From Swiss-Prot:
Gene (UniProt): smpB
Example GO BP: trans-translation
Entry's Gene Ontology cellular component terms: cytosol
Name of the protein in question: SsrA-binding protein
Annotated family: Belongs to the SmpB family.
């Protein structure tokens, strides 16, 4: 009579920001909650979210996600004015905000979102303290990636 309980992964990815990994060296990662309205959660459940050109700013001791695009569902657009590009407050500890703000001010780093995921029943965003790559660094990363692929191809065909 033992029932097997299927465990879902605790963290299900909703959206990735691949461009951030291409444009920045990630130094440290943080997980933050998001303050969302009901229609925004429904849009996220439908997968209508994009993080490509988004970033984090600090205003009056709070962290805000700017540029994340949440497209409203068609039925929401009928009865309310939904702004898909509005800024959304990030939920972080005071200590984490201080650490991020200090690194941005002193070291010239930036804070970018890496992914949006479900943690239990809450939407979380993984943000990273990052340093921008220069053009030659991006080219070097691409060359290294292509070399790894070629190496695996050769080893696979000979092995």
């Amino acid at each position: 009579m033992n029932k097997q309980i299927s465990k879902k992964p605790a963290q299900r990815t909703i959206a990735l920001n691949k461009k951030a990994l291409h444009d920045y060296y990630v130094e440290q990662r943080f997980e933050a909650g998001l303050v969302l309205e009901g229609w925004e959660v429904k849009s996220i459940r439908a997968g209508r979210v994009q993080l490509r050109d988004s970033y984090v700013v600090f205003k009056s001791g709070e962290a805000w996600l700017i540029g994340a695009h949440l497209s409203p569902l068609p039925n929401v657009a009928e009865y309310m004015k939904a702004d898909p590009q509005s800024s959304r407050k990030l939920l972080l500890n005071k200590r984490e905000i201080g650490k991020l703000f200090g690194a941005v001010q002193k070291q010239g780093l930036t804070v970018v979102p890496l992914d949006l995921h479900w943690h239990k029943n809450h939407v979380k965003v993984e943000i990273a303290l990052a340093k921008g790559k220069k053009t030659h660094d991006k080219r070097e990363t691409i060359k290294r990636r292509e070399w790894e692929r070629e190496k695996h191809r050769v080893l696979k065909s000979h092995g």
